Curated annotation (Swiss-Prot):
It comes from Mus musculus (Mouse). Residues 28-1496 are extracellular. The gene is Nrxn3. This is Neurexin-3. The keyword Secreted does not apply. Residues 198-235, 643-680, 1049-1086 form the EGF-like domain. Residues 1518-1571 are cytoplasmic. Residues 1324-1348, 1539-1571 are annotated as: Disordered.
């Protein structure tokens, strides 16, 4: 049949319960009298419900039914108008009317049903339906009144009735019966002028043998499907033969004709040889399933077809005879049909009349469209599924059936097709696709899966769809946003080179955004975005989604609501490649091309909720099994909604906002300064001084149409760049900056290079006021296409962008300074202040950068809430000053600067102008004065500080003037405000003078200006109305002594001279700070040490000692700063040469820091057990070892100590020797001595490995300022030391700290800072780092470290080879002899008192020598002894500290020389005494032992050295007693390593001659010792 297909669909839902009351049910007879009525219990018609009854009448007007909300807005009224039924209803004061097509005043019985479905209300008369739909604000009807039939009581006051005049409407005249609410009968509350009527259409029980009577076209009809009889009245026996055996055989045959379908199988019967052409048909079958949706049976094509399916657990029938589709849905009263029980279906058609019944009880009857009565099909009969179910005409579902089908039979007047039996016996016309099993087996349920976190997802196989395809699934969630499905094709270059997005891909996606479901599709010619829901779908209920596509066109259905779509362009092919992602995207998206239109992907919104019944092209996907196979994190195989609200337990910390999600709470940490699931982790802070920035470089060019940006900031400046996206190829930017104390948002989308409307300039929004108050402020930006929203604290600004272009391109996210300046005309001012919690589209970039989670971060800013002193300049005298360009402050002004001084008075700033206009800022008697004249005479505002400000501390000054002429002066935290009337503009001209004036200008100053001299002190962070001048380079004129930096007047060790537990060492002309064990660097140990960030993929920094320069040590010192969040990883490991097995390892285990080392036999472990260190905060760990003794300390926490059990080595040796036979004494003694060596000496160190990658225990985070026995390996790595190799994810932060010293305060290299020597002979030393001086920095060799010295203990009688670099190993001898030091042991040391001036000690030649040395340098007593640190909480340590010292020596064949080492107090590194575990001691000097060339030589050396030791001691004592004969003066220039003249060995070598010759002239001088 070829007729025009009319898209006429209507749904008939009728449920008839048959029992004893059906035929006997009493009706109501209405006489049409005034004030007649029948009152029933209230019908709940608020959302979804049905009401039905039967009636007959012969009148054309009358009120049938009425209900309302008590006189407000809502009502529903059924009445007769001109013989037709009129439905009139209102919701939320929106009203509509529906009128039936059929005349009903014909004295025949008619069936009427009113169906409510939220905003839609339907009217069905005898199977023909119409509906009306409203668009109210709320999607439900308020029902307050009872239900009235036939009329409304007159005693109800009119104001309580919503519909005016309803009481005056004529009453109904006729019969009504079988009133039902759904399938239940309501209770009659009362009536008036109404009679009971026993007559009914089925009152005479016409059906026999248990047949069911129902109305059809107003006449009683019998349903005989459950009786075994046929005929009009179920009176004809239709059994096929007599006898019980036939019935048993028939039952057996029925049981055998069963088949199991699992979603991919189906049966196909070919009708091409015997086409169907019938006017009446019957289909019978039984099914059993857990599945909610699936095709059961289909035949026909185009406009002639029959489709039977399960749809959301109900049975759906769609029939089209050529003039339009008839659709019927049969639902059970309770539950669904997918309950895994058998259900029987019978469909009968006679001409246009169609009846479908399920289980013989639930019956639906209706009519097809117009007058077509013939069904024709020459196609196929599909059972259980089809090759492409979504493409079948009229198919309401897209997937195949899963479950069991039994006895599928089709018959008409001509043929009977037992389809199940034909498939089982293998009929030639029946094709079986897939593995169909002809018995009923259990089919695994498609269990739902629950995505518990936004990061959870699973991968699905490639979707092989080209021209057509279908996807269906159910989802359930309460969260408004989430990416549900995404897949894309192969990248292709766009032909238009001007396009901003130069690669394109076909893609398909489904996302939930703001509660609405969207389909996104691109088939090569542009993206379409289809909104598939009219109301929000995140209400926690299940929603069924069915997507069907044929070429460019298709439909997406959500709960039967269909939305058509058509793709752009001409292509009908969707070319996809790779996996399809369900629930979200993988963390590593390097291979993905994410379309800008897919906002959930750009914003990192993963789906949190449940998914079930996923079918792709009609075939089921067992997503639970896929999740288990992929071990998908955060995916569970169940779906239940928690009843309790998750936020009721207040899980969010630090004042974070809690939101209820899907079975979870969501903590919004914005504005708290914390992050984490419960906002429990403190976010990292970056400090900016105007020259610093953080730049995140995207791994690829980014294109977005939606952004979420949030952060906190704190600043005292009114101007400065906060955050900006920048592009290398366009002017595109999303920029946030401080502008006059407000936050300014500017979004500029460049239209130059792409085909879009010309840009109308950047969109700009402002929010906030006076934000430069040095308090934390929270900024949020939300952009969705053209919509912009800026929130600063509680101030909200919103805007809409003009034009059609919404795509933002960027390569970088920049903070502090904008480095990408090619496409901007005005560069924003640099930022001075602090940033925290920068989150851009779900990524917390500051913490990601700090922890090494991203490898594309350029970091020049400093971590931590630091006191920011930007670009300080020192004005050394009161006559010093400089001039800058005129201050531009005509209408408003924001000035900021910092100062530090000891002078009570002085000019800070002055600028004159036209007429009397001027501005001056000065210090008067220690207080700030702000003096100005705008033309109305001079005014002065005085700061109200609590005390004078000339206290040599930094102070902050903010001066503002707004458009209302309100002036404010803020000094530190004290504010003074004054409103000035009159002139508002400040018209300045001439130069701006800083820190003073030219000498002749002081006599011509305006009134109220008190200063007559310049400012002496330091100025920093100068901000002149948004301009950050460089006071030195931008100066137009300079006069006097002006220097960059601010050293201050202190030249002696003060309590705060050295920061971060650095050790202050008093020098001749100042002091130096030993920063070696602090992880910091700089003159005062307040600059970060060389810092590397190790990424999550692991990295390794490997230092290898040269083969001939490998040290062996008795004691070691190790310090490093770190921050990390990993629970397990190796920070540093030092290994001996292959085969020896000695090692030392610093690691984190279960979040706690520990050290394990082995120096001979067993592993020795020491651990900080109290507190985990993987909290993301910065920690400094210090480790010391002396033999088997060790200490470990984190920050200022208590020290952890380890001492070996037992007595000293010698005591143990003597005990053992008493029990050994005499002849075995010698070999046993040699063996025990060798074991003793192994227990105390770290032999032949070969390499230092940093990062743990070589051992498989990766460290992730940052490491800073690593120090080990004189080596700063990270500094060496930053300087590209040839002995260091770097591989993996390792990134240097910023630059290697450059250090410049001054004559006042210098800083020695940390590894050399403890090598100030006091000896009885003059010895040369070597340095292993760059010397810091004011003039220049001279590089030296890094090769000679601790390996350059030879140790001096009982194990040192092995051969020591001199360094091969003669220029760096030089000895100087005076008096014509070589000095030798005796052997020493730890027992020789006592806690002797030494000079408070130098804090140095000597190795003990004798107690008298120590006392003499101490007393010889007691003349200089500063305010605080050198060696004092700013750390009062630590316990005092013993005074004697011997630190590692690289020294040079000479070796001859008979005499051993050893350096004598002095060191200042080092209180912050507690160490252990190797022989006295009961007393806390610090170790001796780092002892370095060369590798022995042979064991035999060592044994011989021990015997020889014992005698030699005695001779050396006697010789030293003799020389001491005769010191006057060989006296000399120790030249301080040789003893201070920090002196630039000795910063490398070559210079020292050149001085040898003068040193020797000068010795004779000094022979008769008094003894002098400089320390």
């Amino acid at each position: 049949m070829s007729f025009t297909l009319h898209s006429v669909f209507f749904t008939l839902k009728v449920s008839i319960f048959l029992g004893s009351l059906v035929g006997l049910c009493l009706g109501l007879e209405f006489m049409g009298l005034p004030n007649q009525w029948a009152r029933y219990l209230r019908w709940d018609a608020s959302t979804r419900s049905d009401l039905s009854f039967q009636f007959k009448t012969n009148v054309s007007t009358g009120l049938l039914l009425y209900l309302d909300d008590g006189g407000v807005c809502d009502f529903l009224c059924l009445s007769l108008v001109d013989g037709r039924v009129q439905l009139r209803f209102s919701m939320d004061c929106a009203e509509t009317t529906v009128l039936s097509n059929k005349q009903v005043n014909d004295s025949s019985w008619h069936f009427l049903m009113v169906s409510r479905d939220r905003v839609r209300t339907g009217l069905v008369i005898d199977g023909e339906g119409q509906s009306g739909e409203l668009r109210p604000q709320r999607p439900y009807m308020d029902v307050v009144s009872d239900l009235f039939l036939g009329g409304v009581p007159a005693d109800i006051r009119p104001s309580a009735l919503t519909l005016d005049g309803v009481q005056s409407m004529p009453g109904f005249k006729g019969l009504m019966l079988d009133l039902k609410y759904g399938n239940s009968e309501p209770r009659l509350l009362g009536s008036q002028s109404v009679q009971l009527e026993a007559e009914g259409p089925c009152g005479e029980r016409p059906c026999e043998n248990g047949g069911i009577c129902f109305l059809l076209d107003g006449h009683p009809t019998c349903d005989c499907s459950t009786t075994g009889y046929g005929g009009t009245l179920c009176s004809e026996d239709v059994s096929q033969g007599p006898g019980l055996s036939h019935l048993m055989m028939s039952e057996q045959a029925r049981e055998e004709n069963v088949a199991t379908f699992r979603g991919s199988e189906y049966l196909c019967y070919d009708l091409s040889q015997n086409p169907i052409q019938s006017s009446s048909d019957e289909i019978t079958l039984s099914f059993k399933t857990w599945q909610r949706n699936g095709l059961i049976l289909h035949t026909g094509k185009s406009a002639d077809y029959v489709n039977l399916a399960l749809k959301d657990g109900a049975v759906s029938l769609v029939i089209n005879l050529g003039s339009g589709a008839f659709e019927a849905i049969v639902e059970p009263v309770n539950g669904k049909f997918n309950d895994n029980a058998w259900h029987d279906v019978k469909v009968t058609r006679n001409l246009r009349q169609v009846t479908i019944s399920v289980d013989g009880i639930l019956t639906t009857t209706g009519y097809t469209q117009e007058d077509y009565t013939m069904l024709g099909s020459d196609d196929f009969f599909y059972v259980g599924g089809s090759p492409s179910t979504a493409d079948l005409p009229g198919s309401p579902v897209s997937n195949n059936f899963m479950g069991c089908l039994k006895e599928v039979v089709y018959k008409n007047n001509d043929i009977r097709l037992e389809l199940s039996r034909l498939a089982r016996i293998g009929d030639t016309k029946m094709k079986i696709y897939g593995e169909v099993v002809f018995k009923c087996e259990n089919v695994a349920t498609l269990d739902p899966i629950n995505f518990e976190t936004p990061e959870a997802y699973i991968s699905l196989p490639k979707w092989n769809t080209k021209r057509m395809g279908s996807i269906s699934f159910d989802f359930r969630t309460t969260e408004p946003n989430g990416l549900i499905l995404f897949t894309h094709g192969k990248p292709q270059e766009r032909k238009d080179v001007r396009s901003q997005k130069n690669t394109k891909v076909d893609f398909f996606a489904v996302e939930l955004l703001d509660g609405n479901l969207y389909l996104l599709l691109d088939m090569g010619s542009g993206t379409i975005k289809v909104k598939a829901t009219q109301k929000k779908a995140n209400d926690g209920e299940w929603y069924h989604v069915d997507i069907q596509r044929d070429g460019r066109s298709g439909t997406i259905s959500v709960n039967s609501r269909r939305t058509p779509f058509t793709a752009s362009g001409e292509s009908e092919i969707l070319d996809l490649e790779g996996d399809m992602y369900l629930g979200g995207l993988p963390e590593n998206r390097a291979g993905l091309i994410l379309p800008t239109e897919l906002w959930t992907a750009m914003l990192n919104y993963g789906y949190v909720g449940c998914i079930r019944d996923l079918f792709i092209d009609g075939r089921s996907k067992n997503i639970r099994q896929l999740a288990e196979m992929q071990n998908a994190a955060g995916v569970k195989s169940s779906c239940s909604r928690m009843s309790a609200k998750q936020c009721d337990s207040y899980p969010c910390k630090n004042n974070a906002v809690c939101k209820d999600g899907w079975n979870r709470f969501i903590c919004d940490c914005t504005g708290t300064g914390y992050w984490g699931r419960t906002c429990e982790r403190e976010a990292s802070i970056l400090s900016y001084d105007g020259s610093m920035y953080m730049k995140v470089i995207m791994p690829m060019v980014m294109h977005t149409e939606a952004e979420d940006v949030s952060f906190r900031f704190m600043s005292q400046r009114a101007y400065g760049l906060l955050v900006a996206t920048t592009s290398r190829d366009s002017a595109d930017t999303l920029r946030l900056e401080l502008d006059g104390g407000r936050v300014k948002l500017m979004v500029n989308l460049d239209c130059i290079r792409i085909n879009c409307n010309s840009s109308k300039g950047p969109e700009t929004l402002y929010a906030g006021q006076k934000l430069n108050d040095n308090e934390w402020h929270t900024v949020r930006v939300v952009r969705r296409g053209k919509s912009l929203k800026l929130t600063v604290d509680d101030d909200v600004a919103e805007g809409t962008m003009v034009g059609d272009h919404t795509r933002l391109e960027f390569h970088n996210i920049e903070t502090g300074i904008m480095t990408e300046k090619r496409y901007i005309s005005v560069v924003p001012s640099s930022f001075i202040g602090h940033l925290q919690s920068l989150m851009f589209n779900g990524l917390l970039y500051i913490d990601l950068c700090k922890n090494g989670d991203i490898d594309y971060c350029e970091l020049k800013a400093r971590f931590g809430l630091r006191n920011i002193i930007a670009d300080p300049v020192t004005f050394k005298t009161k006559s010093s000053y400089l001039t800058l360009a005129t201050l531009q402050a005509y209408t408003s002004m924001h000035l900021f600067f910092q100062f530090k001084t000891t002078s009570a008075d002085g000019f800070i700033l002055f600028n004159s102008g036209d007429g009397n206009d001027f501005i001056a800022v000065e210090l008067v008697k220690g207080y700030i004065h702000y003096v100005f004249d705008l033309g109305n005479g001079p005014n002065v505002i005085k700061g109200n500080s609590d005390r004078p400000l000339n206290d040599n501390q930094w102070h902050n000054v903010v001066i503002t003037r707004d458009s209302s002429n309100t002036h404010s002066l803020k000094v530190d935290t004290k504010v003074v405000t004054q409103v000035i009337n009159g002139a508002k503009n400040l018209d300045l001209k001439g130069d701006l003078y800083m820190a003073g004036l030219a000498q002749g200008m002081y006599s011509n100053l305006p009134k109220l200006v008190a200063s007559r001299d310049g400012f002496q002190g330091c100025l920093a962070s100068v901000d002149l109305n948004g301009r950050l001048p460089d006071l030195i380079n931008d100066a137009l004129h300079r006069s006097g002594q002006i220097e960059r930096g601010c050293e201050g007047p202190s030249t002696t060790c003060q309590e705060d001279s050295c920061a971060n537990q650095g050790v202050c060492m008093q020098q001749w002309e100042g002091f130096t700070c030993d920063c070696s064990m602090t992880s910091y660097s700089g003159n005062q140990c307040n600059d970060p040490g060389a810092t590397y960030i190790f990424g999550k993929s692991g990295g390794l920094i490997l230092y290898t000692w040269p083969a001939n320069d490998r040290p062996s040590t008795r004691s070691d010192r190790l310090a490093v700063g770190f921050s990390t969040t990993v629970k397990d990883g190796i920070l540093v490991r030092i290994d001996s040469a292959p085969g020896l097995g000695d090692f030392l390892q610093l690691h984190i285990e279960q979040g706690k820091i520990g050290v394990v080392f082995n120096i001979g036999t067993v592993d020795i472990s020491i651990k900080e057990e109290r507190t985990p260190v993987n909290d993301g905060k910065y920690h400094v760990v210090r480790f010391t070892r002396n033999g088997g003794n060790a200490t470990l300390q984190v920050d200022n926490w208590p020290v952890n100590e380890h001492y070996p059990t037992g007595n000293t080595d010698n005591e143990r040796l003597q005990m053992v020797k008493q029990k050994i036979p005499f002849k075995y004494n010698r070999p046993v003694e040699e063996w025990l001595q060798e074991k003793g060596r192994q227990l105390t000496i770290f032999n032949t160190q070969a390499q230092i490995a940093i990062g743990g990658k070589d051992k498989g225990r990766l460290f992730q985070g940052q490491l800073s300022g690593l120090y080990y026995d004189g080596l700063k390996v990270l500094n060496m790595a930053a300087e590209n030391n040839p002995n260091i190799k770097i591989n993996g994810s390792v990134r240097l932060v910023g630059e290697v700290p450059s250090v410049s010293g001054t004559t006042q305060t210098t800083s020695m290299p940390p590894e050399m800072s403890t090598t100030v020597m006091e000896t009885t002979t003059t010895m040369a030393t070597t340095t292993t780092r760059k010397n810091r001086s004011t003039a220049s920095i001279q590089p030296t060799s890094d090769d000679l470290v601790s390996s350059a010295e030879c140790s001096s203990d009982d194990e040192d009688f092995v051969e020591c080879e001199p360094s091969t670099d003669k220029s760096l190993s030089t000895s100087i001898f005076e008096g014509g002899y070589k000095a030798h030091a005796p052997k020493w042991e730890s027992k020789d040391f006592r806690p002797n008192k030494v000079s408070e001036t130098s804090r140095t000690t000597t190795t003990s030649l004798s107690p008298e020598l120590i006392r003499f040395t101490a007393s010889s340098s007691s003349g200089m007593v500063p305010k605080l002894p050198a060696g004092k640190m700013n750390n009062r909480d630590l316990k005092p340590q013993p005074d004697i500290v011997l630190l590692p010292l690289p020294t040079a020596y000479e070796l001859d064949s008979t005499k051993l020389k050893s350096p004598l080492i002095t060191s200042p107090m080092f209180r912050n590194v507690p160490t252990a005494n190797p022989t006295e575990p009961g007393i806390r001691r610090v170790p001796g000097a780092s002892e370095v032992i060369r590798e022995s060339s042979s064991t035999t030589g060592m044994v011989v050396g021990i015997v020889a050295a014992a005698a030699l030791c005695i001779l050396i001691l006697l010789y030293a004592m003799y020389k001491y007693r005769n010191r006057d004969e060989g006296s000399y003066q120790v030249d301080e220039t040789r003893n201070y390593i920090s002196n630039s003249a000795q910063s490398n060995g070559t210079l020292m070598k050149e001085k040898q001659a003068s040193s020797k010759s000068g010795h004779k002239k000094q022979k008769n001088k008094d003894k002098e010792y400089y320390v």
